[in-house]
Amino acid sequence: MNVLIVEDEIMAQKSLTRVLMQNFPDMNIVGSTTSVKSTVSWLNTPGNHADIIFMDVELSDG
């Protein structure tokens, strides 16, 4: 299962990554972004695919 993490606070991003990797070893973290703009760009890049997106609800740009 491919996972994208969208979080603008780097420590929170790292913590979520660590928790997911420890508890769900079959998850493949395919990317992490820090803004709405960078997330849209990531999603529109050919070849990028996420089955699940963990997204901060209070991003600075959206």
Features from the language model and the residues they span:
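Non-catalytic signal-transmission and effector/linker regions of two-component phosphorelay proteins
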Residues: 1-2
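The feature encodes the CheY-like receiver
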Residues: 60-62
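Short, surface-exposed linear patches
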Residues: 26-28, 51-54
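Two-component/phosphorelay signaling modules centered on CheY-like receiver
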Residues: 10-32
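Acidic, metal-coordinating helix/loop segments flanking the phosphotransfer/catalytic sites
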Residues: 17, 32-52
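Active-site residues of response regulator receiver
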Residues: 56-58
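Conserved acidic carboxylate
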Residues: 7
